[in-house]
Amino acid sequence: MDFELTPEQREIQAVAREFARAEIEPHAGEWDREHRFPAEIYPKLAELGLMGVCVPEELGGAGADFVSYVLVLEELSRADAGVGVTVAVHTSAVTLPILAFGTDEQRARFVPPLARGEVLGAFALTEAEAGSDAGSLRTTATPDGDGWHIAGAKRFISTARHAGTFLLFARTDTSEPGPAGVSAFVLDAEHVRVTRDEEKLGLNSTTTSDLVVDARVDGDRLLHEEGEGFHVAMATLDGGRIGIAAQAVGIAQAAFDAARAYALERRQFGSRLAELQAIQHKLADMSLEIDAARLLVLRAAWRKATGLPHAEEGAKAKLFASEMARRQTAEAIQIFGGYGYTKEFPVERYYRDAKITEIYEGTSEIQRLVIARSILGLRKQPVG
């Protein structure tokens, strides 16, 4: 068993870390305060190959593996969680599903612009009445000649305001309740209309929006087979959760870095905070849990990269990493004391950003269901 990263993985990690420290971290606080989407960052990431890390080179990507991709997500999220999730949705939830389930023509048409960062991707599954119960969606796609007429509304769609390509799910068979009648479609920005942006607790450098769709699309916009959209969605989430787990690790690592530096500098009771046993214990626990979460993430990413079933491992990584990030960002605030509760230091932002990792791409409660059903043999793990 080799715990060392490959030279290529280390190189990609270093590129992402250097860019994040130079181009993202110095501005993250400003983006958060101003609720600004830093559109200028994504073409720069694309120039480095970081918008299509694990996309084959012949389709415009860097040709690296999924482990390299989660390493990139951790580094980006360490600097700014909003940038991290934008890249995560773009890659895990849009580009890779098209790569996995699309025809040769669909891959050639849609993947290169995504991998080159010419357009951003958005994943449109959630609806007002279909959150964790994704099989209850009401958006419909009805046959219209040789195409489809898609009509409905979506809720909480990350990056919708800025996306050019949407992976959208609609019901093609209204006689089939639950997930059986759901299909997946690849749409362009012209097919949807963003109606409002959410005001959120965190992730203020990205947008989360409601949208409506009322458009006719050609038949070649159907991804995979009719009625197989729920399978596409679940396989997408199985991989996407690994990316969100990496995001959570990045946020927690940033909080630890800040708390450690503060403890080494701040003096109380005649000594540095770092010399107080209570603070040492907090930092030790933070480091321990971050390392444990990172190992779970890398195991899940390795299994996906090698084509092994990874639903259970991805759920474990996301569950542990997200809850760990919420705990440890709170501990970072505690180490800072009153200063941690102010906007003067970034730890309050890390705390706000961490919370969502327990909710999107499957809540902690859903992750526990996925894990339980897997260990009890009640769920077949898709490979994709």
Descriptions of predicted regions:
Residues 63-73, 133-137, 215-217:
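Structural signature of FAD isoalloxazine-binding scaffolds in flavoprotein oxidoreductases
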Residues 209-235:
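A short, charged helix-loop
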Residues 136, 190-218:
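Flexible, small-/acidic-enriched active-site or ligand-binding loops
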Residues 151-194:
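A short core secondary-structure module
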Residues 117-125:
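A short, Trp-centered hydrophobic/proline-enriched beta-strand micro-motif
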Residues 64-65, 133-135, 159-164, 178-181, ...:
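Short glycine/proline-enriched turns and hinge-like loops at secondary-structure junctions
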Residues 1-79, 83-89, 101-106, 113-117, ...:
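Alpha-helical interface subdomain recognition
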Residues 114, 129-132, 156-159, 175-176, ...:
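Short Gly/Pro-enriched turn/cap motifs at secondary-structure boundaries
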